[in-house]
UniProtKB/Swiss-Prot annotation:
PANTHER family named in the record: ISOPENTENYL-DIPHOSPHATE DELTA-ISOMERASE (PTHR43665:SF1)
Domain of life the protein comes from: Bacteria
Record-listed substrate binding positions: R6, K7, Q152
Protein name listed in UniProt: Isopentenyl-diphosphate delta-isomerase
Keywords linked to the UniProt accession: Cytoplasm, Flavoprotein, FMN, Isomerase, Isoprene biosynthesis, Magnesium, Metal-binding, NADP
One Gene Ontology cellular component: cytoplasm
Cited function: Involved in the biosynthesis of isoprenoids. Catalyzes the 1,3-allylic rearrangement of the homoallylic substrate isopentenyl (IPP) to its allylic isomer, dimethylallyl diphosphate (DMAPP).
UniProt GO molecular function: FMN binding; isopentenyl-diphosphate delta-isomerase activity; magnesium ion binding; NADPH binding; oxidoreductase activity
Length: 355
């Protein structure tokens, strides 16, 4: 099977397996603010990541590329929608284009239709400095995502089995590539120990890519003759991973992704410490169901709904939203307690804007 054929299968299986909504975000509840003293017109949703200013705390997370015409059309539509809504967009792994020049167009279209937007290049942790620079140049990218997908590779029939040297390669790329580097998980979550190593390696941010969204173990198991189903429930749920990493490194930039389905999930993620939230499966389904117009409408609604929630929480800015009070219960509370994290960090903190 060619890489392009595999990419097409990934899209098909991502749509068929869907999102399984075990993110843990249901365990997070806002403390209601009765006197927000704020108008929606005052809300400022700008956020800063790696020295870059995003107009919105929402971004289109890495999905696809390198699968011929079908992935070309998906990336083209996503980028058009990103341009229309001023939302950053990430491409899927560009390794296919580095190995087959005919696939470059499936990625380059993102910059072609969105010449002034924020675009993330993307490679796996096996990449070299040379490959990282080529990926960034291909898109004139503003940032580089490096994805960690050990479980996906293990379950993938033709996947990698040797993960030695990844941290050293990431550190070398972060030092040399010339744009901010974000390291992201792909649906299995990130622990505070992994995040610590990555921050020490010099990355600008981590995207925790929590369990609860697109499940790459399930996707790859659909492609196997003998399934490895024990990996289908493997990972740290989004809410637990995000809270664990943020509370351990409150001064570092953390991004949220993994099963984020609506504005409430976005708002909760930011309250847990994220500087921005990435959606992939939600946008892919929106595009499939409603085309470009439907996708753009959903993106606009998402942004407006976040503003309304910020208003009722009395949070004028993203930084103020990151200080709002939330109560964590259920499995997420249990996880954090067992990991030595005091959840009153979130529930009793004060923000003078609230009352």
């Amino acid at each position: 099977m060619t890489r392009a054929e595999r990419k097409k299968q990934h899209i098909e299986h991502a749509l068929s397996t869907g999102q399984h909504a075990e993110t843990g975000l249901k365990d997070v509840s806002f403390v209601h603010v009765g006197l927000p003293d704020l108008a929606t017109s005052q809300i400022d949703t700008h956020t800063t990541i790696g020295g870059l200013t995003f107009g919105s705390p929402i971004f289109i997370n890495a999905m696809t590329g390198g699968g011929g015409k079908s992935t070309y059309e998906i990336n083209r539509s996503l980028s058009i929608a990103a341009k229309e809504t001023n939302i950053p967009v990430a491409v899927g792994s560009q390794m296919a284009a580095l190995k087959d020049k005919e696939e470059r167009r499936t990625y380059e279209v993102v910059r072609k239709v969105n010449p002034n937007g924020i675009v993330f290049a993307n490679l796996g942790s096996e990449a070299t400095i040379k490959q990282a620079k080529e990926a960034v140049e291909m898109l004139e990218a503003n940032m580089l995502q490096i994805h960690l997908n050990v479980i996906q590779e293990i379950v993938m029939p033709e996947g990698d089995r040797d993960f030695r040297g990844a941290l050293e390669r990431i550190a070398a790329i972060a030092e040399s590539v010339g744009v901010p580097v974000v390291v992201k998980e792909v649906g299995f979550g990130m622990s505070k120990e992994t995040a610590k190593k990555l921050f020490h390696a010099g990355v600008a941010a981590v995207d925790i890519g929590g369990f609860g969204g697109t499940n790459f173990s399930k996707i790859e198991n659909l492609r196997r003759q003998k399934a490895l189903h024990y990996f289908d429930q493997w990972g740290i749920p989004t809410a637990a991973s995000l809270a664990e990493v943020h509370t351990s490194f409150p001064d570092q930039t953390v991004l949220a992704s993994g099963g984020i389905q609506d504005a409430l999930d976005v708002t909760k993620s930011i309250a847990l410490g994220a500087s921005a939230a990435g959606l992939a499966g939600f946008f892919l389904k929106s595009l499939t169901d409603g085309g470009e117009k439907g996708l753009i409408a959903d993106m606009i609604d998402l942004q407006e709904d976040v503003k309304m929630m910020m208003t009722v929480l009395g949070a004028k800015t993203i930084e103020e939203l990151r200080q709002t009070q939330v109560v964590i219960s259920g499995d997420t509370s249990h996880w954090l307690k067992e990991r030595g994290i005091d959840t009153t960090y979130y529930s009793v903190r004060t923000n003078k804007k609230k009352g």
